[in-house]
Amino acid sequence: MDLDVFVTAHRAEWDRLDALLGRQRRLTGAEADELVALYQRTATHLSLIQSSAPDPQLTGRLSQLVARARSAVTGTRRASWRDVTRFLAHGFPAAVYRSRHWWVPTALLSTLVAALLGWWIGTHPEVQATIAAPSELRELTRPGGQYETYYSSHPAASFAAQVWTNNAWAAALCLILGVFLGLPVLWILFQNMLNLGVGFGLMSSAGRLDTFLGLVLPHGLLELTAVFVAAGTGLRLGWTLIDPGPRTRRIALAEEGRAAIGMAIGLALVLFVSGAIEGFVTPSGLPTWARITIGVVAELAFLAYVYVLGGRAARAGETGDLDAAERSAAVPTAA
């Protein structure tokens, strides 16, 4: 395509569309119809230029023109309760379900790493000595020690809010940093598993493994699952850069990135639940079996939510991405 000839042939249409968009007064019916027609044609022109003769300056101008025209034609779309319901019932669980081949292996391998670290620390006193002095370790692991009082030393509401904020930020980092080929995600995962392994090893070496499990399992099952989902999705996003499949790398990254943003919101809600459990249930006076039961029920409910609702939505074609009309990266074309 001869770009100069193309621009000469259609410049008048683009200028006319720009003029209509700049009108201060309300458009007449005929002008509104003209605006819609020019919007469709300009969107088609933009698509042609992007595919056959990309020119950064011209593409930028037409992209802005099409965006302004789209806003004028469709109006600014506001999120509704229907959108929220659709996201929670279809979009988010489907996105988690679609990523299961990444986060389930991530969860299994990470748990294995934490268990091995815990065994290594618990059976090697010389390793424990590098963590803290013997007196400090005794203070940490004794009945009523720092490990137990950590969950009850602050008001439940403020502690739950702090935990939720920290965990939501960690999950968001896993999703965001996935674009760096997943390497930062692996480091975040290792840090989390190391912390878990240290607690496991020290408490088991002190003969208090039952106390450790009673403190970690109520909130930890759901919390760690959310972290594993975020990490697995981040790794998937990183792999998309390496192997985008049948899609172009740009389109694949845009689609997976938008889905990841939605997952960050959904996982923040999941972590809110685990944070509430950690703040109010874990330090409560409930029997250990009751606290663990609450954690198991919350975990099973989340898995059912993902595999039942999410699986059904995914099989129906839901991906967790935005609707086509809402994708800023998509360019409408004339029918």
Residue ranges and their predicted role:
Residues 78, 95-107:
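Membrane-interface helix starts
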Residues 197-288, 292, 297-299:
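Hydrophobic alpha-helical transmembrane segments and adjacent short intramembrane/lumenal linkers
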Residues 316-335:
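Short, highly charged, low-complexity non-transmembrane loops/tails of multi-pass membrane proteins
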Residues 112-117, 185-208:
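Small-polar-interrupted transmembrane alpha-helices in polytopic inner-membrane proteins
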Residues 1-85:
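Soluble N-terminal domains of membrane-associated systems
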Residues 83-100, 149-150, 154, 158, ...:
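Cytosolic juxtamembrane amphipathic/interface segments immediately preceding
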Residues 89, 130-173, 196, 204-206, ...:
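Interfacial loop/helix-cap signal at membrane boundaries in integral membrane proteins
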Residues 63, 119-145, 190:
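Interfacial/capping segments of alpha-helical transmembrane domains
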